[in-house]
Amino acid sequence: MTPGARPIIGVTGPDRGGGAAWWFTRTAVWLAGGHAVRITPRRPRANMDGVHGLIIGGGADVDPKLYGQELLHVTEKKKRDEPISMWIIGLILFPLTWLMRKLSAVPVTSGQNAARDELEMRLIDDAVRRRLPILGICRGEQLINVYFGGTLLQGLTGLYIEDPEIRTILPRKRIVVESGSCLANVLGPRPVRVNALHRQAIDRLGRGMRVAARDRNGIVQAIEHESLPMIVGVQWHPEYLLQVPQQRALFRALVKPQRRCHVPASEPTGRELVSAA
């Protein structure tokens, strides 16, 4: 890379929709000192040549066939009533959320996108082999886990009992970050509150992966690789929380090598880690 040039960060997304997520992610990468390039099934990259980091963005559910399951038809749990204070905040932020939905063009669905699954699995594999940093966001976190041989919970109904399920773009969900994790090193010691837009989550961890954060109900909110440098997946959407310094730190860790967690260079890479007994 030319001295002084911004690191190139590949950002994956769908062919249709996802405009708001792309715009916010692009802004987050720019604020962190990088330059984002969009990658979609219709605008793919054969490999990670010339790219210095990878963000696997949110979107459609991962095809359950990739982790050995059939598609389950899960009934969504009814959203709980919002307190009046949250209703007022939501009203104030309505113009922003309306704009984001318009930019996204296509409503979020529980469908799959086989072309995107295939593209992103290939890019993750190449990035792992090259020891490039990877940040998975929501679906991206889940796909990273699947890449390493893990499985997903296709629905969360019934898992939010003591603390009802929260679905909001605002940072209302409190999570507990594992002490000594790479994520804790990046986010710092302060309490962490995140947004919640997901309906699936990590079930069985992939090989080499560990839990980096959970919510109060025990649902996995972040994962990371135990030995490979800066492979982190988060269940929330940090690109929509750029007003929060902790969330901007995730993108800085991706862009700036000195901000990352490092491991010895002798560790195995790529599918060696997935196929190892």
Describe the predicted segments one by one.
Residues V232-W236:
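Active-site-proximal beta-strand elements of phosphoester/diester hydrolases
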Residues E141:
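The feature captures the ABC ATPase H-loop/switch
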Residues H198:
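Residue(s) in the substrate-gating loop at a strand-loop-helix junction
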